[in-house]
């Protein structure tokens, strides 16, 4: 399975669909939507598991995700691991 990493700040959270958008700096061309399946690992700053519901706007995160993205605006992909920085 090919993977990639993205680091950014959480810009928007869709709790109903378990997804969030990140942005790097103030550059809207970096906006990416990550879909977070139930089996994805979400880790706090200490490396301990946390719930999707604990993610908050403005958190800086590193996301390990699929190396493909949709051609939509914003691009979308599946997150395998979310780590709060």
Residue ranges of predicted features:
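A short macromolecule-binding patch
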Residues: 27-39
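Beta-loop motif signature
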Residues: 41-43
